[in-house]
Amino acid sequence: MFFLFFWGSLELHTFLDALELIKALKPAQPVTLDRPQAATRAAKFFVDRFPGKSLYAVKANPSPDLLRVLWASGITHYDVASIAEVRLVAETLPDATLCFMHPVKTPEAIAEAYNTHGVRVFSLDCHEELDKIVEATGAPDDLTLCVRLRVSSEHAELSLASKFGTELSDARDLLMATRQAADSLGICFHVGSQAMSPHAYVQALDRVRAAIVDASVTVDVIDVGGGFPSAYPGMQPPPLEDYFAIIDRAFESLPISYSAELWCEPGRALCAEYNSIVVRVDRRRGDQLYINDGAYGALFDAAHIGWRFPVRYLGDTRSSTLADYSFFGPTCDDIDFMAGPFPLPADIKAGDYIEIGMIGAYGAAMRTGFNGFGSSEHHTVGDEPMQSMYTGEARQHWRADNVVSINR
């Protein structure tokens, strides 16, 4: 059974699951499925268990509907990386606290963020950016400035170690200069996306300790950034509680102000489970399936970095025997290809539907209209995501796997 809700001229559908949706709609275009309950659970998990303040990294999924779900679940601070994101969150959530955490900003963006949208938190990784912020804001006395330190991404699936961050050898002078310009001084870093070990944060916080000792400055904020992982096929990270515990211990041992705050910037961890997508098979060629979404749609990561997403056939008349497939997207471009492997029924054929899960992070956000393809149709479903970091079963599964590997 599905339900219809009317809000002005907007008709919203809530379905039990993807199977009910395709039976009712038989969609010819890709359909993105929203799971507000999954985002609510993730947000409350961070609000209740992370030993500090959680800032949602808007770039991971800037959906206004998602932003409202996170706000209602206790996420009050937002990591914005462009003036467009500043405007979006300010319009959607007028009472939210915005933190402009991109280390390279235009003077115009800084000035608008400060003067129009009330942004008081900015990040930087060089003296030029510090001078730019001070000049664009008029050298006020209410700035929180976070110096971004370069740290290793060795434990992450996607490195973020080369583009931003001051080297430890240069941090002393920058921290001292920033301390003079800031009401509150912070240090931030990013261990890389999808960090598969909590020890990534230990190593990073060791560098933070060295920077503080060398500069001999009072630090008011430690921002451990993002990197908190989600579960995908072939990637089952440790429980998030393990990350929180190890960060808390390292934070408490730092030589910082007694009233210093601990921040984090989860993106993927808050939104990966929020979305899946329903696609239709347009053609089968051996073990290759031509589907109606791809590299220029919600499956950018599956194509360009070989990310594997969970898949399931939507129907009840196909073989129980599975075979591995790769996908071609709908465009005319050869790189619109996702190697997988994606396990699906051995007798799948054109006209069948597939649900691809865990695309809430950097899925819908990366969608384009290239080659005339793409769909913005969304519907809400009430079932659980295909994988989760927030159920006892997922955490138990990881611990069981670990015991087996240790005893071998």
Predicted regions and their residues:
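Active-site loop/helix belt of alpha/beta enzymes
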Residues: 151-287, 371
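A charged N-terminal "starter" segment
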Residues: 1-142, 176-182, 214-218, 381-408
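Active-site-proximal loop/turn and secondary-structure-junction residues that shape catalytic pockets
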Residues: 60-62, 84, 104-106, 126-128, ...
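Conserved, mostly hydrophobic/aromatic
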Residues: 39, 59, 82, 113, ...
